[in-house]
Amino acid sequence: MAAAKIKKGDTVVVRSGKDKGRSGTVLQVLPKDEKVVVQGVNIAARHRKPSQQNPQGGIDRFEAPLHISKVSVADKDGKPTRVRFETKDGKKVRVAVKSGETIDG
């Protein structure tokens, strides 16, 4: 598997699907499944039956994972960009293709 170009804490833009165009911060990266969890994007609901711990039951809303191919890292201006790796001062860093700026994180 290739090195992860998207990391926890990155701001990303959703490129396809029901949340296309929305952006958020990566909360979790699931490398084995090639998925990411993005804050405020791809909200799913789980219906809970009443139980002893939760006597009222109800609907729990949570961020469901998105496939990593559906998101792109956002540049400083908030637009999606591709990412490449470069070596600077002997360290491997991520660089935004559009602007050429180093991505923090």
Curated annotation (Swiss-Prot):
What's any one GO cellular component for it?
A: ribosome
One GO BP annotation of this record? translation
Q: Which SMART domains match?
A: KOW
What keywords does the record list, in alphabetical order? Ribonucleoprotein, Ribosomal protein, RNA-binding, rRNA-binding
- Name the Pfam families on file: KOW, ribosomal_L24
What are this entry's molecular-function GO terms? rRNA binding; structural constituent of ribosome
State the InterPro entries in the record: KOW (IPR005824), Rib_uL2_dom2 (IPR014722), Ribosomal_uL24 (IPR003256), Ribosomal_uL24_KOW (IPR041988), Translation_prot_SH3-like_sf (IPR008991)
> Whom does it interact with, and what assembly results?
Part of the 50S ribosomal subunit.
Protein family per UniProt = Belongs to the universal ribosomal protein uL24 family.
Q: What role does it play?
A: One of two assembly initiator proteins, it binds directly to the 5'-end of the 23S rRNA, where it nucleates assembly of the 50S subunit. One of the proteins that surrounds the polypeptide exit tunnel on the outside of the subunit.
Instruction: Write the protein's name.
Output: Large ribosomal subunit protein uL24
Species per Swiss-Prot/TrEMBL record: Novosphingobium aromaticivorans (strain ATCC 700278 / DSM 12444 / CCUG 56034 / CIP 105152 / NBRC 16084 / F199)
